[in-house]
Amino acid sequence: MNTLAEKLVDAWKKRDLIKINSEELPKSREESHNIQKQFQDVLKKKTVGWKIGLVSKNLQEGAKVNGPMIGKIIDETVLMNPLKVDYSKVPDCILECEFCLKFLEDTKMIPGAEHKTGNYEAYIALELVSTRVHSESKKDLDPINMMNLNIADNGGAGAIVIGDQIKNLDKINLDSIQVEINLNGNVTE
């Protein structure tokens, strides 16, 4: 087993951050996915979905990376709104406004699949992007090495808060949806 995978599992269990050296960094996207798989195999937690970031070529070019960032959504990290988030359980996290899809049947991602209706539901979501790796270990990484490390680190998965269902998705401008966050008494939209 890869030492980095073992260290990431230990950090996940302890809700802690680890320091790594340059020799431990994954050398390729393939190695990153292998480390993530080892991480999942040792962690032995139920996978309930996937998180996929940087999906468009424009985003990838802007971030100077060579593909999307993929991680698994683990059952215990799916949180339902309304709730209070204990940030000590999601180390070094940032919030990202997202939306998520719940597929109601097996769906193959083939050309034209996006035109099928009735096989999924859409929900407002907040992702708590997290890491198990101390920022000191990341400070000098170029975008590709950072991406490979983030993939190995389960795609930066921390937790996801599922909000209200988005009805009539095809008729809604997603940019128009308001999200209210109460962070220690400070309400923002």
Regions found by a protein language model. Give the residues of each.
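Catalytic-core "active-site belt" of small-molecule-metabolizing enzymes
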Residues: 2-189
